[in-house]
Amino acid sequence: MTENGQFLDYKNVFQENRGAMHDGRLQLLKEKIVFKNNKTGKIDSIQQNDLHSALWRRVARDFELKFQMNSGQVFRFDGFKEMEFERLKDFVKNYYKIDLEHQELSGKGWNWGTTDFEGNEMMFQVGQKLSFEIPLNNVSQCTQNKDEVTMEFHQNDDSELSLMEMRFFIPPSQDEMIDKVKDFHDNVMAKADVLQVKGTAICVFQDLQCLTPRGRYDIRMYPKFIQLHGKTFDYKITYTSILRLFLLPHKDQRQIFFVVSLDPPLKQGMTRYHFLILLFYKEDDLAVELSLPDDEIEERFGGKLQKDMSGPMYEVVSRVMKHLVQRKITVPGSFKGLNGVQSITCTYKASSGFLFPLERGFMYVHKPPVHIRFDEIAYVNFARGTTKINKSFDFEIETRSKNNFVFSNIERDQYASLYDFVHNKQLKIKNIGKDGADFDLMVDSDEDADVHDPYMERMKQEAAEREKQVDDDDDDESEDDDFQPETNVAEVEEEYNSDVGSASSGASDEEEEDGEEEVEEKPKKRKKEKVMKERRQKETPGKVKRKKKDPNAPKRPQSAYFLWLNENRGRFKAENKGISVTELTKLAGKEWKKIDPDEKQKFERMYQKSKVKFDAAMKEYKSQGGGRTSSSPAKKMKMKSPKPSKASSSMVSPSKFKSKEFITESDSLSSSDSDAEVKSKNSPPADEESASESEAASEEEESD
């Protein structure tokens, strides 16, 4: 709640609509009361001069504020705390010149009592106290029987539980001239929202093309509702259920969409139509005559409508609809796309259509139609495919309620205009990088996708940066840690062992070598797996280990803010029952900014005292040897030093088994391990020599 001398602002208030509670924002201003529905965006405005009475009473959801207007219309708002009564009472008294009365309800639970009709409501009273009340505009039908009256109610799809009907038994009167049942029925029907076709329509539009629901309909305009008469179905739409009107030009500039937003929607079986979409051709003309007398037309519409009207069909229909429904018509605003078109061709849910960027939202037509207000949008996202032949991108919208809308196959040439529009409307863009390069990459793309694809270039650049980062991490490691003589010997063995089979010849030699390889194959594989595992561990950048907290170290003092929060946490929970930890923290942060500096200074002094004690305790703790950590010497060895061959060879055990690839003639003649190793690297293996000798011998035998 925000309080100011000029207004009261409540951001978490609920309005009842045919059994469903819709959350929204309520503002009590000096001259009017405004409520905005968060779901539909509909704004209800109550002028100060139209207020008749105001009531405050206890209901299931905290407390309720009820306003009744001079016309009998009623507005109810739930979700107030009991402590708000005095503040609201003073505000209503000072600015609206009416008293906010506290009304007590009857809780006896009796099902008999008396009824009273006041305004648009029927009140059921028990013992001179109100038990319940029924808004008569929620009644869809009322029938009378001998001693009973049955009331049926409109249903709301958003309501989990709905009241279907109520029956009232009315005992007969002793006076035969008075029929109480009929009087009760007439009082209900006088205010009920029953759509009955009585008299002639104000005007009729014949054979209009309708995209949703699909077909051709005759549209009849009555004083309180619209009737759509088709070959198969009939629909009735009350003027109060119409939220918005849109007049949107087709891309070909020859057709016009006229869109009517509905809440509650039209129903056809299990199908719901939240939008009525009519399609007009600009060259079609229409002449219509209103059935109202001239003086009534002048009084109701103030010269904005005439008895006889003619012109383009879309202009006449939209003009009559606007003044009968009393809703403004929304048209495209400042957005100009490719070739000056005010719409964007795209695909939504496998159907092609048009996306219209409007001044306060986006409208997509026509299958299925979608309207997204800017205040519903959490962020937008520009995405595109990775193929080189793709010359389009996707426009994604995520709402605050976590609903995603993806409009795909948008031409790349539309990107610049759509990006500028989104940026000017200050919508959050999800995928803008730290360098802001996404816009340039899309706009500067060559038209020939085979020549240059900036998206692929960006992906390659990011991959190169990641590889460079991994290489930098590898360079930081010490070479001494990597040096393992035994592993190096095993690697050399594997390198030379791979060519042994190809160097040998003769059946007997191959059989012998195959037998030896079977024996040695398993340990060699295990060595190879171990080496590869160590390599992978080396290539993977190591994780930064968090330093373990010393349990014996003195605890740091809390800041002034947390000292204040701990002292006031109980008060926040008491004032806001059921509040989450996140919301409590936000609320506390806002109040901390607003508190008096002297109050803040009090907690600052408490923090300084605690800090002095902490510094002294930490000094004593360190003087006793606390907080010291030992570092491994291996991590400190970062300098590269040359390694002599003797040092490396001496680390290999003389009794270490060597495969026959390493045994050369020099091994039997030289006593130095280093000489043997050098020769084994520079001279071919012994098996290769023996293999060549055996080949030569076999050639001689064949020649003989």
From Swiss-Prot:
Alphabetical list of Pfam families matching this protein: HMG_box, PH1_SSRP1-like, POB3_N, Rttp106-like_middle, SSrecog
Keywords for this entry? Chromosome, DNA damage, DNA repair, DNA replication, DNA-binding, Nucleus, Transcription, Transcription regulation
Which GO terms label this protein's molecular function in UniProt? DNA binding; histone binding; nucleosome binding
DNA damage recorded as keyword: yes
Its GO CC terms are:
FACT complex; nucleolus
The listed locations are: Nucleus; Chromosome; Nucleus, Nucleolus
Q: Which SUPFAM superfamilies match?
A: HMG-box, PH domain-like
Task: Give the source's domain of life in one word.
Answer: Eukaryota
Its main localization is nucleus
Q: Is the DNA damage keyword given for this protein?
A: yes
Q: Write out the ranges of the annotated region (Disordered).
A: 460-562, 618-704
Which residues, if any, are the signal sequence? Answer: none
Q: Where is the composition biased (Acidic residues)?
A: 470-484, 508-520, 686-704
Which InterPro entries does the UniProt entry name for this protein? HMG_box_dom, HMG_box_dom_sf, PH-like_dom_sf, RTT106/SPT16-like_middle_dom, RTT106/SSRP1_HistChap/FACT, SSRP1-like_PH1, SSRP1/POB3, SSRP1/POB3_N
Q: Which residues bind DNA?
A: 554-622
Comp. bias (Low complexity): 498-507, 644-656
Q: Where is the composition biased (Basic and acidic residues)?
A: 460-469, 531-542
Tell me the GO BP annotations in alphabetical order: DNA repair; DNA replication; regulation of chromatin organization
Family statement drawn from the similarity comment of this UniProt entry? Belongs to the SSRP1 family.
Q: Its function?
A: Component of the FACT complex, a general chromatin factor that acts to reorganize nucleosomes. The FACT complex is involved in multiple processes that require DNA as a template such as mRNA elongation, DNA replication and DNA repair. During transcription elongation the FACT complex acts as a histone chaperone that both destabilizes and restores nucleosomal structure.
What is the annotated quaternary arrangement, including any partners? Component of the FACT complex, a stable heterodimer of SSRP1 and SUPT16H. May also be a component of a CK2-SPT16-SSRP1 complex, composed of SSRP1, SUPT16H, CSNK2A1, CSNK2A2 and CSNK2B.
**Protein name, please?**
FACT complex subunit SSRP1
